[in-house]
């Protein structure tokens, strides 16, 4: 209890939390104590992809493709780019982390190549 109170007081002092708004902290993936950092944002759809590109410092480049080049990929291959192995069993994906739960930049960075 003292630890959590200390974290909240510290976050208020450094200006990360605005008074009057509920504060949410990420719970570590093993289900134990909350992380030090409050949730920064909740993003969905194209916004996830834009943050991914910015945080991972990936630049989109236009390339000339041959007419025979297959620009369509199957759903499983496309989704595999945004998956990472979850500690324990199962998988997390970036949509679950950032859209449903809210995320911090460090979590998006885990998906960088």
UniProtKB/Swiss-Prot annotation:
Belongs to the insulin family. Insulin decreases blood glucose concentration. May have evolved to activate insulin receptors (INSR) in vertebrates. Molecular docking studies reveals unique interaction with the human insulin receptor. In vivo, insulin-like peptide injection reduces blood glucose levels in two models of zebrafish diabetes (streptozotocin- and glucose-induced). Also shorter swimming distance of zebrafish larvae, an effect which is not observed with human insulin. Disulfide bonds join 44-99, 56-112, 98-103. Keywords: Carbohydrate metabolism, Disulfide bond, Glucose metabolism, Hormone, Secreted, Signal. It is found in: Secreted. InterPro entries: Insulin-like (IPR016179), Insulin-like_sf (IPR036438), Insulin_CS (IPR022353). Residues 1-22 form the signal peptide. Its main location: secreted. This is Insulin-like peptide 02. The keyword Disulfide bond applies. Residues 23-42, 62-87 form a propeptide.
């Amino acid at each position: 209890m003292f630890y959590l109170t200390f974290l909240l007081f510290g976050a208020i002092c450094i200006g990360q939390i605005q008074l009057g708004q509920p504060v949410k902290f990420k719970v570590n993936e093993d289900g134990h104590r909350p992380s030090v950092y409050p949730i920064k944002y909740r993003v969905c759809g194209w916004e996830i992809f834009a943050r991914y590109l910015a945080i991972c410092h990936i630049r989109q480049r236009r390339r000339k493709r041959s007419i025979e080049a297959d620009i369509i990929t199957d759903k499983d291959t496309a989704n595999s780019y945004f998956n990472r192995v979850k500690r324990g069993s199962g998988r997390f994906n970036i949509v679950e982390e950032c859209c449903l739960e809210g995320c911090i930049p460090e979590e998006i960075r885990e998906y960088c190549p």
